[in-house]
Amino acid sequence: MSSHPPVTWIKHPLAASDPDAAGGVVVQDGRIIEAVAAGQTPRTRVEQTFDASRHVLLPGLVNTHHHFYQTLTRAYSPALNKELFPWLTTLYDVWANLDEAQLALASELAMVELLMSGCTTVADHHYVFSGALEHAIDVQVETARRLGVRAALTRGSMSVGREQGGLPPQSVVQDEATILDESTRLIDAYHQRGEGAMVTLALAPCSPFSVSRELMVDSARLAEQKDVRLHTHLAETEDETQYCQKLFGMRPLDYLEATGWLSDRTWLAHGIHFNDDEVARLGQAGTGIAHCP
């Protein structure tokens, strides 16, 4: 029996996104090693074939912002049809009681749904770390590896709870030192670099209003030190804009820049309520947007 991964011809697709691959592609160990033109056969010795005549051949889709754990509560009736802040306060107490087995189930369900829709790469933003979810990212790494998903797992965080005037219960809030220490541990343990990396880590304070300014600044510094990316929610609702102006005396993007986040290392979730000047600034900085209204 051969010890190397099999060479597979994905043969004669119904349609292909690349005309040079109208006859399919030859793959081995997760890589395309040959594109086959229409009416041709592979030059490479093939060990198995997959009949793609009823399939469309295209690159895997990429989901740039997800919350795997929320898969379990997407039909939770008390939270339906609510604006962001009331929706969050309704669900935080539910999420605070999730455990690692439930997170593993939610992550598997979310990733299988993505794979079935043609999505092979996903960025997940997990920021709920109760006592039962201390190793949430470790659980997600294991699940992603088992399913063969390329995962950019962002280590989220919340350091401002209800006792400090925030939205989440104290049971899911962590202190800044714990957040930074755990972020460092996860990067050192799991972050892969270079072509073909299947698991990468990013730092992802939940939002400007759920963490301290200190954590925003220190996360940016740690990301630069470790050469990883930054992710957070920004400009998702008008309520957020008003909250930032009241709390910080500036708009969300100005606060982002003041904390060292406005760079090409950063991509933001939502990004709905930017004015024209802010859109131009984002473009000049090379900051990405996962635009999901």
Describe each model-derived feature in a short phrase.
Residues P13, V25, G30, R54, ...:
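Divalent metal-coordination and catalytic microenvironments
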Residues C119, V149, D227, G286-T287:
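A structural motif
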